[in-house]
Amino acid sequence: MTARTYQQKRAALHDAQDYCVDIHNRTIFLHAHITESEDDPGVDYRMSSRLIKNLHLLKNLNEKDPITIHLQSIGGIWHEGMAIYDAIKLSSAHIKIIGHGSISSMGTVIMQAADERVIMPHAEFMVHYGEFSFIW
């Protein structure tokens, strides 16, 4: 393996792990950012801003080619989830979402934004009545 090939593979691995995007394969990994001190926080600002940036990145590289999103989410904050939903719906590219593991609450709403949905054999969904609050 040449030094350049090694560096390219290392950069691709870094992007997939740190930024949750595989540019070469037009794939986004949509899951919560987990640290050692917390459980899965679900859909939050970090998750939504990362997804929106990655969608724009892939769209700017090529508007026509499809994008695949791998989703695993226990749910989360309504407004952040709707930001993800809107960003996916706004995309001119064909979006396929593949659901893994637990797709719960807001995760099920995000799944509906896709042009194509694939559910892995051992994935499970959880849907519940919504709650609302007023912002003054």
Annotated model-derived regions:
Residues 1-136:
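Terminal-region recognition feature
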